[in-house]
């Protein structure tokens, strides 16, 4: 189970940092927030970053891992303004991340 709500600018910064190094990443979700550890394709650089629970407007999660195409996620986030709220929810049945930004809903398959 994963359901969260966060300001778009915070999420864009987090994903943008990761996206500067890798195209895909595994998100380690826990009750404390989201952590990403990733190594670039040439195995030269590594990134480890966290988005703590307090950064979210609301956050409910059980420990899990989600593989995500960072480039596609960044493209989805381009429609969000700085102050827009982004709602994220994992669809366990179809193994997708559902992203809601205002009236826009996008379901992204998880890797």
Label the model's feature ranges.
Residues 1-19, 25-111:
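DNA polymerase sliding clamps and clamp-related checkpoint/processivity subunits
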